[in-house]
Amino acid sequence: MAVFEGTFTQTEPLRLAVVIGRFNDLVTTKLLAGCQDCLKRHGVDPDPHGNQVDYVWVPGSFEVPLVARQLALTHRYDAIICLGAVIRGQTPHFDYVSAEVSKGIAAASFQTGVPVIFGILTVDTMQQALERAGIKANHGWDYAMNALEMASLMRQLRSNVTDSYSQTQSLPAAFPNASIGKLTAESEEV
């Protein structure tokens, strides 16, 4: 048996995408700054003109899952970080948006095999959002750490699975259309 655990130092450069909701940008820009600080301190060049991190701005948190899934389907990224802020108001809108964004981000990850990190603050007040985006702590940092760890872990798991299959020279019968190391259109469940 083996034990697998992601690390925060990469031997190979990572390729990441960050999807940011523009709505509540007072909060989301602070989350992004925390995310970039973490990446830089862990050896990832966060420069948007560099070759390691792509940034995609969308109107709000509700649009984040669709874009994250589209990026994940390209299989160009080791992980995708989703940043946004949904703040409760006087109507049930908060409940609908929060639930669908959460489901959508999880589905994007499950359907593609790419870690898609849930970095959407769901809070009752703007004060709570600001506290989580830099006044008390910056969760943008935490979301970047999650992405680094999951990208590392998935690389380890893919490598181990590929090595195991190459030793037996065949894929399990349960996955007749699958290929080693990448998801094919025939094996993808949508």
From Swiss-Prot:
Reaction(s) this enzyme catalyzes, per UniProt: (2S)-2-hydroxy-3-oxobutyl phosphate + 5-amino-6-(D-ribitylamino)uracil = 6,7-dimethyl-8-(1-D-ribityl)lumazine + phosphate + 2 H2O + H(+)
Protein name per Swiss-Prot or TrEMBL: 6,7-dimethyl-8-ribityllumazine synthase
GO molecular function (one): 6,7-dimethyl-8-ribityllumazine synthase activity
HAMAP family from the UniProt entry: Lumazine_synth (MF_00178)
Active site: H93
Biochemical pathway: Cofactor biosynthesis; riboflavin biosynthesis; riboflavin from 2-hydroxy-3-oxobutyl phosphate and 5-amino-6-(D-ribitylamino)uracil: step 1/2
NCBIfam families the record matches: lumazine-synth
InterPro entries: LS, LS/RS, LS/RS_sf
Residues given in the record as 5-amino-6-(D-ribitylamino)uracil binding sites: F23, S61, F62, E63, A85, V86, I87, F118
Family: Belongs to the DMRL synthase family.
EC code(s) of this entry: 2.5.1.78
PANTHER family registered for this protein in UniProt: 6,7-DIMETHYL-8-RIBITYLLUMAZINE SYNTHASE, 6,7-DIMETHYL-8-RIBITYLLUMAZINE SYNTHASE DMRL SYNTHASE LUMAZINE SYNTHASE
Binding site for (2S)-2-hydroxy-3-oxobutyl phosphate: Q90, T91, R132
Organism: Nostoc sp. (strain PCC 7120 / SAG 25.82 / UTEX 2576)
Gene Ontology cellular component terms for the protein in this record: cytosol; riboflavin synthase complex
Physiological role: Catalyzes the formation of 6,7-dimethyl-8-ribityllumazine by condensation of 5-amino-6-(D-ribitylamino)uracil with 3,4-dihydroxy-2-butanone 4-phosphate. This is the penultimate step in the biosynthesis of riboflavin.
